[in-house]
């Protein structure tokens, strides 16, 4: 078994462990502020250089002083490399030797007041084999050059502390960024008398090629006042220096002044054009007046209607063209199709015929713009269709206007809305301007129809919302008895008209009365009735709870409910009947209209008596059952009767033909469905089914599904658990 010991067991950094030495940071800074000498680590390097010089100067130390070993040699810590002889690391060929080497550090953390830095040039240090041969490197010091550099050169490296802090006590230091390595010299500092060469000092050599490149890149451009062209050329030349990124940002001053200058240029250009146009108009009027007074008898040539070159230009911008707006096309067909809608009803009555276009509109010069006239575009939208406009037209569906009796409608107004009761085949635009499409009208947009909540069960979409959308389609032949007409009676079984007609009150209605209600939105009427019943039940339950809680008779309670509900509906209907009764000559239409209003009033009263009173009774009995907290047979009978009443209420909204002919099989199925008692356990088993499920396409909704058939999909709402 071979155990490999690591070669590098301890890292030595300046005669101590690596964990003992910490670079200065916010965590280990003392509370009192430190100067620049204690904030950097270059004095450690300088002290070690002095220590190595002292060790070389005294090879035999005194007996009381500890001798310096080869491992703790400070100079080998600094100037060591992988191949040095003093390195005892056996793995020195391909790894670190365990010592820090500060030979490559070059930053501007050690500034000095003067610009002269030198390595020790003693003969002992030059003769030493480990330190190598070191020569002094000097940068000439000239006060005039320093001031000129600070004033003209923006790229000169600026020390961090501007030379006002303390420095190391040792004279020796390493060259940093403040001296020769990153010093950028300008053309003013490169004069031949500026450098003072000292004897015995190797100066930094500067080649003439670097001088020319530096002076050409960094020297500021000197203007020649003699030639104006050179001045203009130099002023337009961009400077080679980099700007600060803070000026180039969006909110900087450069952006602000650039925008300001462009705005001023635009306004000046507009003012110049306006003044030029005024002067040209004035000169043209002056020439016209002088020519008319000078030669009034000269026969003028007949003006030929020739379009200018400016009128032949395209007047449509590319932004409008992307939206489908083209202004320079000859649209004779679209203008001809839109003309009957643009003309007023008075023009329609005076014309007395269909709007046939004039023969000159189809000619080629009908849409040519005259040279002196202004171009007035048609404000109406064109018939050009883009996919976005088709989508917009499909999503916005007009709400139907309720039908008015045909005697009050003028024949000139029937071309906008062709209703089932008003439009006749002989009326204006009734049979000619037919689009050939089945027009659908609804009370809600297609977005709400498509975006309703739904789940997918066995690859079939099942809606979760109970909304009934009143989509009524009209055939293009306007046939009322067509097989494609969707009757609202099959969809809206809880409407006030048909729910009352099932009871036998006013079962035969006029055809006009059915037409009057065929265009209505029963969803809104049903919601209003629900709100009214809820408010009335709140009012009556607050006043009559003490009197009705003990009694189980619901008839007396329904008699007390009706007077509070009836005044909410009757005044508007009575005002209509009074206004109709004040007419002096009552025709047969007004009599039938009054009869319809009376029937409507009785139907609404019957609806409130039957449906809403039954719901109030249901709520009271539920509250009575919850307060008892017992499962005696009497309360089980109450629950069974409640569920049967609720079942009767759900079946009360069928068609009159279906209501009277209920099969016995349906009754047996209903009794099996609604029986609350379980024969095996004797407990209550309630299968709640709302009256919404008995009608419409949502019969097989989420409540009537088995749990094994329902699977989660992406269309399921987030907050719902199945």
Curated annotation (Swiss-Prot):
Listed Basic residues bias regions: 275-285
Q: What is its main location?
A: other
**Where does the record say this protein resides?**
Bud neck
Q: Which domain of life is it from?
A: Eukaryota
Disordered: region residues: 52-94, 110-161, 187-245, 275-325, 349-389, 488-511, 558-588
Compositional bias ranges of the Polar residues kind: 187-197, 378-389, 490-510
- GO cellular component: a single term: cellular bud neck
Q: Which residues cross the membrane?
A: none
Q: Which family does it belong to?
A: Belongs to the AIM44 family.
Protein name in the entry: Altered inheritance of mitochondria protein 44
Q: Which species does the entry assign this protein to?
A: Zygosaccharomyces rouxii (strain ATCC 2623 / CBS 732 / NBRC 1130 / NCYC 568 / NRRL Y-229)
Q: Which gene encodes it?
A: AIM44
């Amino acid at each position: 078994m071979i155990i490999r010991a690591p070669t590098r067991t301890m890292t030595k950094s300046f005669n101590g462990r690596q964990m003992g030495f910490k670079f200065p940071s916010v965590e280990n800074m003392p509370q009192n502020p430190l100067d620049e000498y204690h904030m950097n680590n270059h004095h450690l390097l300088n002290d070690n250089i002095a220590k190595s010089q002292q060790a070389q100067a005294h090879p035999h130390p005194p007996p009381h002083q500890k001798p310096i070993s080869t491992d703790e040699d400070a100079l080998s810590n600094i100037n060591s490399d992988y191949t040095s002889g003093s390195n005892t690391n056996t793995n020195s060929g391909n790894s670190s030797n365990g010592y820090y080497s500060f030979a490559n550090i070059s930053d501007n953390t050690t500034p000095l007041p003067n610009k002269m830095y030198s390595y020790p040039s003693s003969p002992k240090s030059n003769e030493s084999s480990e330190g190598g041969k070191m020569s002094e490197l000097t940068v000439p010091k000239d006060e005039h050059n320093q001031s000129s550099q600070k004033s003209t050169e923006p790229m000169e490296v600026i020390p961090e502390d501007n030379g006002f802090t303390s420095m190391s006590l040792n004279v020796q230091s390493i060259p940093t960024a403040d001296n020769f390595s990153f010093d950028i010299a300008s053309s003013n500092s490169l004069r031949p008398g500026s450098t003072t060469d000292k004897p015995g000092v190797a100066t930094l050599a500067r080649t003439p090629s670097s001088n020319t490149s530096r002076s050409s890149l960094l020297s500021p451009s000197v203007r020649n006042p003699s030639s104006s062209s050179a001045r203009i050329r130099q002023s337009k030349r961009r400077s080679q220096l980099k700007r600060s990124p803070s000026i180039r940002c969006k909110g900087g001053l450069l952006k602000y002044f650039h925008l300001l200058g462009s705005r001023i240029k635009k306004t000046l250009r507009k003012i110049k054009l306006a003044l030029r146009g005024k002067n040209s108009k004035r000169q043209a009027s002056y020439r016209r007046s002088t020519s008319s007074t000078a030669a009034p008898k000269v026969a003028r040539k007949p003006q030929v209607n020739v379009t200018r070159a400016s009128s032949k230009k395209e007047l449509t911008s590319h932004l409008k063209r992307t939206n489908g707006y083209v202004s320079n096309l000859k649209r004779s067909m679209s203008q001809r199709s839109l003309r009957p809608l643009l003309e007023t009803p008075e023009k329609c009555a005076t014309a007395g015929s269909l709007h046939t276009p004039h023969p000159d509109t189809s000619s080629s010069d009908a849409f040519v713009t005259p040279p002196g006239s202004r171009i007035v575009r048609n404000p109406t939208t064109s018939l050009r269709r883009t996919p976005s406009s088709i989508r917009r037209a499909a999503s916005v569906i007009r709400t139907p206007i309720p039908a008015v009796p045909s005697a009050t409608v003028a024949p000139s107004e029937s071309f906008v809305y062709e209703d089932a009761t008003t439009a006749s085949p002989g009326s204006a635009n009734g049979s000619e301007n037919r689009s050939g499409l089945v027009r659908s009208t609804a009370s809600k947009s297609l977005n709400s129809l498509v975006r309703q909540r739904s789940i997918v069960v066995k690859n079939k979409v099942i809606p979760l919302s109970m909304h009934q959308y009143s989509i009524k389609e009209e055939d293009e032949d306007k046939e009322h008895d067509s097989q494609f007409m969707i009757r609202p009676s099959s969809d809206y079984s809880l409407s006030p008209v048909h729910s009352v007609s099932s009871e036998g009150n006013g079962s035969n209605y006029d055809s006009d009365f059915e037409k009057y209600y065929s265009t209505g939105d029963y969803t809104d009427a049903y919601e209003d009735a629900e709100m009214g019943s809820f408010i009335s039940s709140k009012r009556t339950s607050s006043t009559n709870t003490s009197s009705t809680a003990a009694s189980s008779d619901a008839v007396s309670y329904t008699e007390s409910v009706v007077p509070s509900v009836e005044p909410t509906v009757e005044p508007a209907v009575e005002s209509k009947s009074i206004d109709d009764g004040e007419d002096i000559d009552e025709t047969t239409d007004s009599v039938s209209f009054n009869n319809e209003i009376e029937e409507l009033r009785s139907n609404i009263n019957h609806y409130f008596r039957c449906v809403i009173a039954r719901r109030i009774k249901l709520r009271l009995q539920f509250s009575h059952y919850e307060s008892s907290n017992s499962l005696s047979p009497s309360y089980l009978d109450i629950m069974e009767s409640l569920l049967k009443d609720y079942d009767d209420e759900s079946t009360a909204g069928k068609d009159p033909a279906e209501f009277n002919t209920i099969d016995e099989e349906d009754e047996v199925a209903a009794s099996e469905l609604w029986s609350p008692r379980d024969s095996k356990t004797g407990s209550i088993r309630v299968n709640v089914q709302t009256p919404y499920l008995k009608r419409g396409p949502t019969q097989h909704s989420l409540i009537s599904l088995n749990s094994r058939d329902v699977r989660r999909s992406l269309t399921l709402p987030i907050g719902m658990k199945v």
